Amino acid sequence: MPKAPNRETFVAHCSSAVYQPHFQSFLRNDLGLDHYALIALPGGVQALTLESLLPKFSWAGWRWIKFLMDLDSPSRVILIGHDDCRWYHRGPIGQMLGPERARQEKDLRRVAQDWKQRFPECAVSAFYATLASGKVAFDVVR
């Protein structure tokens, strides 16, 4: 009999094809997740921070998340960003200044805080992935 899907965890990360297998491996092997709700967008959670620059992106993103959160009521949320994100380089926020990792970690922290305010029953964790020599390291973002 197949294992029942895990409705206790929600994951949000970038849709990067390069990082997909690494995200999946991390979630499965390091965090022990076989099933989870997922939203994957270019830039990951960054779209959720664009209230003033691209308000429709932010509104739609939070609307999709609310739908999925209401559907399964997960108690755990995992947010993942990654190094060399093309959305951060070439997307609508590419003109913003500052090191990419610092910007992404700031966005991850902000979305984690917003998530906790919107869904206070959830534990939210954020990670930043870096790829070097074919291996990916996932650092906790605090």
Where are these regions (language model features)?
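Short, conserved beta-strand segments within well-ordered enzyme catalytic domains
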Residues: 10, 37-39, 78
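Histidine-centered catalytic micro-motifs
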Residues: 76-84
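Short Gly/aromatic-enriched secondary-structure transition segments
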Residues: 24-31
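A short beta-strand-loop structural module common to alpha/beta enzyme folds
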Residues: 34-44
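A generic structural signal for alpha->beta connector loops
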Residues: 32-35, 121-123
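Divalent-metal-activated hydrolytic enzyme cores
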Residues: 1-23, 42-60, 67-74, 86-142
